[in-house]
From Swiss-Prot:
Protein name (record): Methionine--tRNA ligase
Record SUPFAM superfamilies: Anticodon-binding domain of a subclass of class I aminoacyl-tRNA synthetases (SSF47323), Nucleotidylyl transferase (SSF52374)
Record organism: Acanthamoeba polyphaga mimivirus
Keyword check for Magnesium: no
GO biological process: methionyl-tRNA aminoacylation
Protein family per UniProt: Belongs to the class-I aminoacyl-tRNA synthetase family.
């Protein structure tokens, strides 16, 4: 048994609900992987929480006329409600606006400061006179100046261009403007603290040389190194955030009115959220744990460059991320998700309309894993969603399980001894490799292929004619039920509620399917007959519910 620390990129609690792209990129991917590892028999802690500090929270709180704390309390509960509905099974779900977060951030900063990796700079920064505030990178927009984007007049945030994925120097943005009031900012000098990434480059390179990132994740990380790492500002002129430890050095007293940049201390939240849950968090993390992080591709450089540089430079004995499970972007009907523009489906809406449609979270989980943007951007399409539910969930998986148990109901066989065949051992092996490599689409594809094989087996053996003629069908039914049992076990990480509900009707002497790769027998007792597990979705009705017409 191994230990796995699975974390999903911490979502901002500055909106009422995450959209489906947020869910599939980090949280659902983390949940599927954590469940898979638990099914293998490993010890797993799956952790996430809300990333509560920063400009986005301040702006949202200002709009709603509440304090930042009140806003975070409100949206923490709303987000957790959505994640619970989608059956995302966290072992720990916390938040970053805690005393532990401050303590651990200070510990890391103090190490960096004492080791000479923090420098001071007086910089000229964009200041919006209308909003009376310095503009954080995410609230300063303009045209990206990098090749390819400059010619196409791509509008970028001030931290990183979403199109070319390159870092942005805010002073080089073309025609910058405040994203809040849309007016051009003035330039105003201010003092800030910088993380000396240039000095930390060799240590980051050593880290990247030893971790097991796949080629896509490594390419994103190495691209930053090839451009060259420069000192990065880690403080902001804000009120809401982790304060600077000004008592460390009298020189730091002038930073009393500043806080740490959210991307400096947000990943530290993985430590602090766990620390708030268990006192032995350091001991557990340093006990040979494999750390797997799930996230969208735009978060990768902060987790593979900035975060490890900070921890390594502090010289504190804390583990770092071993593997990153990254995705591209999920679009909605070909467009980028946007609540303000009414584009996309959001978690709270999905939870609202699903009971009206007579479906549960597994329908959405299934389709989202089917289209998971693993190697390129993909798009959620309502017509395709309805079609996939019909062809894959109802006609393939559902039909196979229903046929087997409808036939079994007509026989006296309730205690079966199943010898797994070499063909299905290979299915399990291929599935295990795919899931371990974060190829969840391939894992689901293997399940669908297995179900199709099962359907063909039933069709070719025609047990219904033998039952009608009073002939012995125990061998056929044992094989068919055994295939169902394997299939449902492999589907547990993807559609856990449906798979576990069906498996509860089967009592076995072995709950770990991956132990059967050696070819062991398994005894299966039928407790209840499984009924038709899935239903079709009416597209017209689905659209009406989404549009609020019903």
């Amino acid at each position: 048994m191994q230990k796995f620390f699975v974390t999903s990129a911490l979502p901002y609690p500055n909106n009422s609900s995450p959209h489906l792209g947020n869910l599939v990129g980090a949280l659902l991917s983390g949940d599927v992987y954590a469940r898979f590892k638990r099914n293998q028999g490993h010890e797993v802690i799956y952790l996430c929480g809300t990333d509560e500090y920063g400009t986005t929270t301040m702006i949202r709180a200002r709009k709603e006329g509440v304090t930042c704390r009140e806003l975070c309390d409100k949206y923490f509960e709303l987000h957790k409600k959505v994640y619970d509905w989608f059956n995302i099974e966290f072992d720990v779900f916390g938040r970053t606006s805690t005393t532990k977060q401050t303590e651990i951030t200070w510990e890391i900063f103090n190490g960096l400061y004492n080791n000479g990796y923090i420098e001071e700079k007086t910089t000229v920064q964009a200041f919006c006179e209308k909003c009376d505030m310095y503009l954080a990178d995410t609230y300063l927009k303009g045209y990206c100046y990098h090749d390819g984007c400059r010619e196409n007049r791509v509008i970028s945030n001030g931290d990183q261009c979403e199109i070319c994925q390159k870092m942005i120097d805010v002073n080089k943005l073309i025609n910058p403007f405040c994203s809040i009031c849309l007016t051009p900012p003035i330039q105003k000098s201010t003092d800030h603290l910088y993380l000396s990434l240039d000095k930390l480059t060799p240590l980051v390179q050593q880290y990247l040389d030893r971790v097991e990132f796949d080629s896509r994740i490594m390419a994103i990380s190495k691209a930053w190194l090839e451009i060259g790492l420069n000192p990065r500002c880690i403080t902001r002129d804000l009120e809401w955030g982790t304060p600077i430890p000004i008592n460390l050095d009298p020189k730091l007293e002038k930073y009393a009115d500043k806080v740490f940049y959210v991307w400096f201390d947000a990943p530290i939240g993985y430590y602090s959220i766990l620390a708030n849950e268990r006192d032995d968090w350091r001991e557990w993390l340093n006990s040979g744990v494999t750390w797997v992080s799930t996230q969208a591709k735009d978060n990768v450089p902060f987790h593979s460059i900035v975060f490890p540089a900070s921890v390594i430079g502090s010289n504190i004995e804390l583990p770092l991320i071993d593997r990153i499970c990254g995705t591209d972007y999920l679009l909605y009907e070909g467009q980028k998700f946007s609540k303000s523009q009414g584009v996309g489906l959001f978690g709270d809406k999905v939870a609202e309309i699903s009971p009206k449609l007579g479906i549960n979270e597994d329908y959405w989980r299934f389709y989202l894993m089917k289209i998971r943007p693993e190697t390129q951007d993909s798009s959620f399409n309502l017509e395709e969603f309805v079609r996939i539910v019909k062809t894959d969930l109802v006609n393939n998986i559902g039909n196979f399980i229903n046929r087997v148990f409808s036939l079994l109901e007509k026989t006296p066989y309730r205690d079966l001894n199943y010898q797994i065949s070499p063909e299905y051992i290979e299915f399990i092996k291929k599935y295990e490799v795919s899931m371990d490599e974060f190829k969840f689409r391939d894992g689901l594809k293997i399940c669908l292929e297995m179900s199709s094989r099962g359907n063909k087996f039933v069709q070719s053996t025609k047990p219904w004619t033998m039952i009608k003629d009073g002939l012995d069908t125990q061998e056929i039914m044992t094989e068919a039920v055994g295939i169902c049992w394997i299939l449902l076990n492999l589907l547990k990480p993807i559609i856990p509620k449906s798979a576990c509900d069906m498996l509860s009707n089967l009592d076995t002497d072995n709950q770990n399917i991956f132990c059967l790769i050696g070819g062991s027998n398994i005894n299966i007792r039928i407790l209840n007959i499984i009924k038709l597990p899935f239903k079709n979705i009416d597209l017209k009705q689905l659209r009406e519910f989404i549009e609020g017409k019903n």
